[in-house]
Amino acid sequence: SLVELGKMILQETGKNPVTSYGAYGCNCGVLGSGKPKDATDRCCYVHKCCYKKLTDCDPKKDRYSYSWKDKTIVCGENNSCLKELCECDKAVAICLRENLDTYNKKYNYLKPFCKKADPC
């Protein structure tokens, strides 16, 4: 769910997921879609594509369990869809951390300027 995703982003990046990524670029946040503006925005684009592959669970609402061991996210689900959901969220959180150097405040609230993205 959005709760676990937010916790993962905070743990990996140290940034508030809502204020830092909730309206970032063309793809971060619930309403985002469009050609990525930078590597950070591309993380969110890939994340949305990952979500599109999930058919048996709701990424925004369905809860899953994970642990934070030695600064590493460990998904802990037996249900295959929830495990995949956790892995999608884990991947975006790690991607955002790995691309912290591309984060640019000018890309917050950019949605009206987004061009159509390539399909996943």
Curated annotation (Swiss-Prot):
Instruction: Give the family this protein belongs to, as stated in its UniProt record.
Output: Belongs to the phospholipase A2 family. Group II subfamily. K49 sub-subfamily.
**Protein's recorded name:** Basic phospholipase A2 homolog LmutTX
Record's subunit section: Monomer.
Expression across tissues is: Expressed by the venom gland.
Q: GO molecular function terms here?
A: calcium ion binding; calcium-dependent phospholipase A2 activity; phospholipid binding; toxin activity
Name the InterPro entries for this protein.
PLipase_A2, PLipase_A2_Asp_AS, PLipase_A2_dom, PLipase_A2_dom_sf, PLipase_A2_His_AS
What compartments host this protein?
Secreted
Key words of the record: Antibiotic, Antimicrobial, Disulfide bond, Myotoxin, Secreted, Toxin
Q: Main location per UniProt?
A: secreted
Tagged with keyword Metal-binding: no
Please name the Pfam families in this protein's record: Phospholip_A2_1 (PF00068)
Biological processes, Gene Ontology terms? arachidonate secretion; defense response to bacterium; lipid catabolic process; negative regulation of T cell proliferation; phospholipid metabolic process
The superkingdom listed in its UniProt entry is Eukaryota
Something else the entry says is: This protein corresponds to 0.8% of the venom protein content.
Q: Which organism is it from?
A: Lachesis muta muta
